[in-house]
Amino acid sequence: MEISTLRHRTGPCRFSLVPVLVAAALALAVGGLSGVALAQEDPLAYRLEIYVVSHVTREDGTREERYTETSEARPGQTVEYRIFVENVSDMTLPAGVVQIRLPVPEGTEYVPNSATPSSDRVLTEFSADRGMTFSEPPVLVGDDEQRRVAEPTAYEEIRWTFFVELEPGQEETLVYRVIVR
């Protein structure tokens, strides 16, 4: 499944984020839980919001970020994904069990240091080899003989593992940004 498209129109190319939304939702559903036997229904509900980030200079000279909800973006624009994960089951989900994986869509580059960072609540890891391996930065790629550190702009997936129990009704928010090429 292709997760991004470039649509040509009269004027500049636009990056369609709608297929990305669908693919991200699928990635969430597939990567939602690992290592736990649960009923067939997913105990997690997901909501994804997509914003174009712009910067404006206020009268006092300070810069401020503005967010515009969108389904399309143009090359050079920064897009912020906000993922809301809620435990919709009636049971507490154990710490270390809930994992969320999301792609860095084709046609975009991950913005360094933009993902919800690792903390005592969540571990944030990246992959630069199509999800084969994940690690916290620095992310290494290549064979043993040609091992090198991947630039953050080469990251292809992000994985978060929650180190806290998720109580029924509890919602957690994850964020990351990309730049449209």
Predicted feature residues:
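Compositionally biased, low-complexity repeat tracts
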Residues: 7, 27-31, 57
